[in-house]
């Protein structure tokens, strides 16, 4: 593991031990960065911001789903859950629908997912009809549907894998 990868791993590992594992970081052993190279301050800041996003999302597990809900007291729908997490964790204002969220940031391939990425699904015979936050280890956290609560689920579960529509990595500069 090179120095850059070690820094990222340590920053995330000490932020939230429940989800920080090297597999979820997609660290590439072939990265040829020198031992003395330090990631730019903005990049390091975003890595620590990811921990805030994941921690805030986990704090909300168990809260009920409510269509159009946007507060912990009343419940959340999927997109309002994502919007709330990013606002509370980073003071970033995101759009209120899964479809509009899908247009933000950089498109990410399934195999390149990193914690904090938004994952999208076709759950209503419509592209980008559901959204969650990737937390690592092929898992994501989301507000599923009426009668359910915010929870962590496996992306590799057949139901979600068949409905996976894509992922994006939110650029904080886009939201200002």
Describe the predicted segments one by one.
Residues 2-3, 19-31, 37-45, 108, ...:
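Aromatic- and glycine-rich peptidoglycan recognition patches
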């Amino acid at each position: 593991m090179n120095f850059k990868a070690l820094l990222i791993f340590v920053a995330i590992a000490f932020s939230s031990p429940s989800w920080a594992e090297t597999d979820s970081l997609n660290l590439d052993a072939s990265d040829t960065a020198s031992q003395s190279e330090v990631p730019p301050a903005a990049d390091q800041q975003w890595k620590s911001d990811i921990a805030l996003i994941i921690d805030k999302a986990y704090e909300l597990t168990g809260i009920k789903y409510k269509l159009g809900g946007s507060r912990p007291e009343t419940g959340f729908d999927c997109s309002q859950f994502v919007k709330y997490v990013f606002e509370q964790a980073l003071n970033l204002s995101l759009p209120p629908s899964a479809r509009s969220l899908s247009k933000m940031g950089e498109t990410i391939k399934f195999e390149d997912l990193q914690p904090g990425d938004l994952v999208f699904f076709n759950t209503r015979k419509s592209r980008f009809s559901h959204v969650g936050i990737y937390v690592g280890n092929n898992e994501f956290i989301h507000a599923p549907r009426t009668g359910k609560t915010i929870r962590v689920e496996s992306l590799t579960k057949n139901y979600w894998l068949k409905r996976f529509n894509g992922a994006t990595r939110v650029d904080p500069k886009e939201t200002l």
